[in-house]
Amino acid sequence: HSYGEYVFDWSWADAYRRHGQHYYPKLLSAVPFTPAAGPRLLLAEGVAFADLENELLATVGEEMARRGASSWHLLFPEQPVAEELAVAGLGHRTGVQFHWHNRGYRDFADFLDVMQSRKRKQLKRERRLVAEQGLQVRALRGPDVDAALWERFHHFYQLTYSRRSGHGGYLNREFFRLLGQGMPDSLLLVIAEHGRDVVAGALYVIGADTLYGRYWGCVEDHAQLHFETCYYQGIDFC
């Protein structure tokens, strides 16, 4: 199957089926649930990908034949690797993502100042609306997130998957506990409180120069709350 890849190739699988072919099994090199480009091939220190490319492709071909696989998929590789494989004749699929870049902004207000007046007013109104609904939004670094809050966020995560996919998600409660325990300094959890209740949350992973938005969920629907927790708070942090 293709679950958890965040690359939607269902139409390819359907095309194979309509032509009497089997799309599965397929070979996959990826980091599960992570639609962000990065290293996907483990190489010894000092070894360049170009040095092993021919051997790699030959081995992949042999493994495809041995397993009866239709294809090999390398998801979200680093750009140089993707370009070299395209030159070697592999199909190169281009996806579209939207990334926000900090172009030297000092803070969120500085970011707003570069916008046209209409858009600036709109964003201010959206953020103000969250507070007007009685919501308090806080951004917590990993060390400040306790076990009960991780438990709560796992519930949010399950609700999002249940609403969109009809199942409770791929990651269990223990995953989030271990995440908070093993790499707390690399985590940012944005929570929204309504009275005494935590009603929504968004989880980010902090990289060397990038903030990665990962999961979100809520138990109450409020106007603009998704944008506040998943976009504006992230921009604020950056």
Mark where each language-model region is.
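N-acyltransferase acceptor-side catalytic subdomain
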Residues: 1-238
